[in-house]
Amino acid sequence: MIFKKKYIALAAAFSLAAASVTAQPDADYETVVSPDDESTANDGKKHYFTALTGAAVTSTGIFLWNKYMIGAGWTQVTADYVAHFYEHEQSWDKDWFWTNFVLHPYQGALSYMAGRSANLNRIESFGLATLTDFAWEYFCETNAPSKNDLVYSSVGAFPVGEMMYRLSLEADQIHYLMGYTLNPERIWSEFWTKQKPRGTTGNIYELALSFDLGTSYARTSFGYDLGNQYEVFPVFASPKIAIVYNDPYGHDSNEPYSQFNLDISFALGAGSGRAMKEMDESFFHDIRVMSDGMLFARAPAIGETASTLGLVFEYDFIWNNLIQLSSLAPGLAFKQRIPFEKSDMEWQLHGAWLALGTTQYDYLYRGATETPNSLFREYSYTTGAQLVARWKWKSLAGQALAFDLHGYAMYDFADQEQDFADTGWELLGLLKASYELPLSRRVRMGVKDELYVKKTLYSEVEDIFLVANTVSAFAKLQLK
């Protein structure tokens, strides 16, 4: 019952945030028209059949692939199982971390984009993603309907789907295949409607590609007689793309996600050689998706500054040898740019309700205790609070000094507890500091230091304290 109330409250918050959009005229949301093909002009009409069939075809394709190509056991549903769907009890599932918190939001985002590509508004597209997710959980799997999937594949579909939908239109300016890659649902909608989705282009405010080389050191203080574990990951390489969609400062809009930040990175390197888990001995990996988007924004006039105040939504994902973290968190944000004669100073402060998140249960994830014989997950589902604080100084010559703090106060609630795990508070902080110098108008070099700290306050088992420091040098191509 607690889960249902939280889910309904979160869904209602999204509906209210999007309601202002449907009440506003679409004057600032123009149609994308191909310069060499007037047939692509959008008629503005809602194509519900195209949206429903697009979402259904995608879900059916995913189901058939898993059933016949992979032979997944969970796809072996029967007519009797489907007929008694109302008897299926929900549970917190134990799927692979990547599957639950990247692939499921992406699958939901496909349904969301099927709606948006057929001119449905955000509420309708969110409803389509929710409907598709419900059908998947109750009719397409023999597993118990997953509580976390019902959130991440619907609510999580909104930020992922809206960002990809908007970036797909921007990618058309490079090549139409890039647009289809970011939003595959356009293939279906454009085939039937003979028109491109609605939206504007030219909204990319900043776009940067960077490449890091670095090293990482960690110390974990376990309870009981396990003592301290020291690990050194000697070298890793990490490509990254950073996108700022519209200027974060002085932004005024009723359009959800008319301004957002999106950072995606992947790292691979040498393992520590002495980890408790064999894989960590050989390889270092780090995959991150860090984002925040404005749901509603106003630009208050405060002196000579460019300021933004409004509702924000945070979607974060981190998965590496030391961390398993995800968050869906709506909240408030204030952003401000202060101009000086030869430089600018920018700062942001976000405070959010962490509606549903995860963090690794270190005793299992780090292999510190014996692995249970039954099916288990190495992470705990959480709720709590999230804080984002940013500060940046940049000169007109191109130098930049920046600090970025992501803080999480996560509570492992009892409803999701596993028999061999524990509940309690887990406090996490991720602080990054960087400095960069320009080599040319587009190329920059810099250094970065990242400090990760985690302290647990468990109810019954002994607490854990983890500190990790990562140092790297990077080259950046500032495309915009």
For the regions a protein language model found, what residue spans apply to each?
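N-terminal targeting leaders of membrane proteins
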Residues: 21-102, 107-108, 116-117, 122, ...
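Intrinsically disordered, low-complexity segments enriched in Gly and acidic/Ser/Thr residues
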Residues: 349-353, 376-443
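Sequence/structural signature of outer-membrane beta-barrel proteins
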Residues: 136-145, 218-220, 267-277, 314-322, ...
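Cleavable N-terminal export/targeting peptides
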Residues: 1-36, 172-173, 480
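Outer-membrane beta-barrel architecture
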Residues: 113-114, 238-244, 290-296, 331-337, ...
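Alpha-helical transmembrane segments that form the membrane-embedded catalytic/substrate-binding core
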Residues: 107-108, 140-169
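Outer-membrane beta-barrel "beta-signal"
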Residues: 209, 214-218, 465-480
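Small-polar-interrupted transmembrane alpha-helices in polytopic inner-membrane proteins
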Residues: 120-142, 154, 158
